């Protein structure tokens, strides 16, 4: 792990013009400070990862409690367009869409975030792997199908874990498609197991 951190930190430092006098470990520790600082705002106006959450907590009732509960509408935080920038980002003159969780809190509110996470979590809980069939009673194709379920499971969990870290799940349609495809595949596999085991 230490070797991986050192390599990543040195690559980060060389790619983004970091201070050559700093060690790889100090670059890594500085990046942790950026992640966990609750008041970190870059010169460009982009908020740090934790800062996005704390900023939302302090300013979410811009037009009343409805904004906190249901958000301010899709694209309200868009900072990547000069043609149609999000009006919440323009209102504060800040980049509020640095993480998917921040985007969701501003755009669909706390109710939307809870429903989104609860729906995925419910699928993962219900579809968690259980030993139902004996592998000796299954064909090779069935084993291959069942063997893919843990990969879909881990992929969906990884997508959920990315919400407070990156905006990628909200801005990449293909990743959203893959997330719902993985969840759908888990449901199909689970249903196939129930049918083959005689439980409906």
Feature roles, as predicted:
Residues 13, 169, 197-200:
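Transmembrane helical bundles and short interhelical boundary loops of multi-pass, membrane-embedded
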Residues 133-135, 187-200:
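Membrane-interface junctions at the ends of membrane-embedded or membrane-associated helices
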Residues 1-40, 61-63:
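A membrane-periplasm/extracellular boundary helix in multi-pass inner-membrane enzymes
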Residues 167-179:
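Loop-to-transmembrane alpha-helix initiation sites
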């Amino acid at each position: 792990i230490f070797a991986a951190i050192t390599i990543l930190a040195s690559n980060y430092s060389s790619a983004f013009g970091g201070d050559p006098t700093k060690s790889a470990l100090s670059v890594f520790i500085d990046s942790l400070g950026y992640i966990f600082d609750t008041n970190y705002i870059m010169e460009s106006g982009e908020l740090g990862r934790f800062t996005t959450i704390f900023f939302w907590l302090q300013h979410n009732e811009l037009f009343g409690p409805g904004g906190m509960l249901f958000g301010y509408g899709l694209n309200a935080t868009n900072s990547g367009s000069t043609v149609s920038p999000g009006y919440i980002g323009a209102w504060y003159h800040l980049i509020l869409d640095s993480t998917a969780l921040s985007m969701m809190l501003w755009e669909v509110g706390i109710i939307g975030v809870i429903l989104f996470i609860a729906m995925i979590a419910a699928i993962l809980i219900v579809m968690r792997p259980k030993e139902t069939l004996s592998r000796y009673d299954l064909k090779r194709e069935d084993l291959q199908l069942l063997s893919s379920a843990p990969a879909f499971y881990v992929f969906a969990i990884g997508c959920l874990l990315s919400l407070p870290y990156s905006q990628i799940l909200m801005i990449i349609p293909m990743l959203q498609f893959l997330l719902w495809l993985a969840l759908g595949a888990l449901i199909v596999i689970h249903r196939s197991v129930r049918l083959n085991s005689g439980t409906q």
